[in-house]
Amino acid sequence: MSLMHWKIDFTEQADRELLSLDKPIRERIRKYVRDLEKLDNPRMRGEPLTGILSEFWKYRVGDYRLICRIQDDKLLILVVKIGHRSEVYKKRR
């Protein structure tokens, strides 16, 4: 049994993005996040991003992506963006 417990937190933007989704996908993402908290190492599920986004990790939930920053010193996974895979990486103007 693991002694480490990860905490998940959402930025205001990610929280708004989550609330804007249809209820079934919102619930699926919430379940995924609860499962992430139980892992010894959240990197076992996600994939590192590259280039200018290399400080972030992505998690796939169906056609949606969670973009996160993993803070090992705080055992925190900070969700910074949630969106459809076709839109989530686009820069807002």
Predicted feature residues:
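Enriched for short, Lys/Arg-rich terminal
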Residues: 1-7, 16, 27, 61-64, ...
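Residue-level recognition of oxygen-bearing side chains
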Residues: 13, 54, 87
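Surface-exposed, Lys/Arg-rich phosphate-binding patches that contact polyanionic backbones
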Residues: 13-24
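Residue-level signal for well-ordered alpha-helical positions
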Residues: 21, 32, 91-92
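Generic structural signal for secondary-structure transition and capping sites
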Residues: 23-26, 38-41, 87
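Short, well-structured alpha-helical segments
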Residues: 26, 30-34
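A short, surface-exposed loop/turn module that caps and links secondary-structure elements
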Residues: 34-59
